[in-house]
């Protein structure tokens, strides 16, 4: 797992670090996604210009640079539902532009809207999960089965002492 702030200027250094870790091996999978603020409906509603011109809207282009360089068999790209409606300055949808760019990199893509609560996470968190496969393939998106959740948040915290606001210990 690598965690970097990605920019055009930082790409060469990031690639150098990845190349050193790979030591000649190929990547099978890249997983990641840009920050959601530029695509989120909440972010757009708070922004005077609706996030138009925000550089974060275009971080998917840097993601594509990783796909071009490493050509993994698959990639997984995650983001908020607002990505489906976020528009570029010319009125085109960022999501459509993104998928077009990934296709130019050699990938067939498909996506689903998944809710984390269906897979054992104790919160409703719907996300777009875009999967790409290198080359032309049909029907490659995995069949993902929901898990039966038998836990509730209250059950997880039932053995902790009750505290009020301002009580407790803050540890560094």
Sequence positions of predicted segments:
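N-terminal Rossmann-like NAD(P) cofactor-binding module of classical short-chain dehydrogenase/reductase
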Residues: 29-31
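Short glycine-/small-residue-rich Rossmann-like dinucleotide-binding loops
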Residues: 35
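S-adenosyl-L-methionine
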Residues: 1-21
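Class I S-adenosyl-L-methionine
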Residues: 20-24, 39-172
